[in-house]
């Protein structure tokens, strides 16, 4: 239950940031990692320091590269059939 409240607090802190894509990316990364919850529980400023280095351009670029690689592997699979 304590990790659940830590997740809520982390989401509240990140909601105050200006870029919503940072919140989505960081939340999806931290859902499965318990050390991240321990870090959130220790202090909020540490979360802010980690949250802000992620820029929206990095998030968009990584999302685009994942989509492009999935598309190319799908096309390769179709060609081989």
From Swiss-Prot:
What is the tissue localization of expression for this protein? Answer: Expressed in brain, notably in regions involved in long-term potentiation and long-term depression, such as hippocampal CA1 and CA3, dentate gyrus and cerebellar Purkinje layer.
This protein's source sits in the domain of life called Eukaryota
* Other information: Located on the opposite DNA strand of the CNGA1 gene at chromosome 4p13. Its transcription may play a role in CNGA1 transcription regulation.
Protein name according to UniProt: Putative CNGA1-overlapping antisense gene protein
Print the organism lineage.
Eukaryota, Metazoa, Chordata, Craniata, Vertebrata
